[in-house]
């Protein structure tokens, strides 16, 4: 499977660029009245009602609730430091859980990588989506920083998905396009045609 893209739409603005349509939209606590075709939605577990095309999201403090939930797909937001024996035991019984790896560590790359390696050590095969948060107002700055944060994880073959969250003044379309661009640059998912010039004659 190609890596998935999760996009933030907690502000209720659900419009997407057809060329860069995310696989999942994280809507937080409110499902929008108008949903995009072909997109599945993620809601916080305590407000999720089992609507078609929606899935619950849990945090690591909600393990008992997650174990009782009968959804076929669940998302677990979890930092590396929360990877306790209890969490590992729960994941071994719930292969349907997608882990959304979070980090506030100065070395985010190292902590994301450590989480995946710990899962491997425990023999777990749950998919891992990397959550990367920024506060950028300039598209180029977002592209550079997010590509640097994600590049090594992609080339190491550790990336099952990407979730870019930006609190700056950039449109959702820019953030979505950045996520797809990173995956295309890593040769893990193609979303647009690339034109490459011949190094000899310059023709495309």
What do the PLM-derived regions correspond to, one by one?
Residues 18-21, 108-115, 146-149, 171-179, ...:
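General structural feature for long, well-ordered alpha-helical segments within catalytic domains
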Residues 1-110:
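Active-site beta->alpha loop and helix N-cap motifs at the rims of alpha/beta catalytic domains
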Residues 111-116, 120-137, 174-177, 188-204:
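Small-residue-enriched alpha-helical segments and adjacent helix-cap loops
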Residues 13-17, 86-90, 110-114, 137-154:
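Catalytic cores of alpha/beta
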Residues 29, 70, 91, 116-123, ...:
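Structural signal for hydrophobic packing residues in well-ordered secondary-structure cores
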Residues 98, 156-171:
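Glycine-rich phosphate-binding active-site loops on the catalytic face of alpha/beta enzymes
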Residues 35-42, 168-188:
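C-terminal helical cap(s) of enzyme catalytic domains, especially alpha/beta-barrels
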Residues 26, 129, 161-164:
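Short hydrophobic alpha-helical runs that function as membrane-insertion/retention elements
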């Amino acid at each position: 499977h190609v890596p998935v893209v999760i996009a933030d739409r907690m502000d209720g603005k659900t419009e997407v660029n057809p060329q860069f349509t995310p696989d999942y939209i994280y809507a937080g606590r409110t499902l929008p009245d108008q949903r995009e075709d072909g997109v599945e939605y993620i809601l916080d577990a305590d407000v999720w009602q089992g609507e078609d095309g929606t899935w619950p999201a849990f945090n690591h403090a909600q393990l008992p609730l997650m174990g009782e939930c009968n959804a076929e797909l669940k998302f677990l937001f979890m930092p590396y430091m929360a990877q306790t024996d209890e969490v590992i035991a729960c994941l071994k019984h719930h292969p349907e859980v997608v882990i959304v790896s979070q980090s506030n560590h100065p070395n985010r790359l190292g902590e994301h990588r450590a989480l995946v390696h710990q899962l491997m050590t425990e023999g777990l095969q749950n998919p891992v989506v990397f959550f990367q948060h920024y506060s950028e107002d300039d598209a180029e700055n977002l592209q550079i920083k997010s590509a640097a944060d994600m590049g090594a994880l992609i080339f190491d073959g550790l990336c099952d998905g990407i979730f870019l969250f930006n609190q700056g003044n950039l449109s959702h379309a820019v953030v979505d396009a950045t996520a797809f661009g990173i995956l295309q640059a890593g040769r893990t998912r193609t979303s647009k045609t690339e034109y490459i010039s011949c190094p000899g004659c310059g023709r495309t």
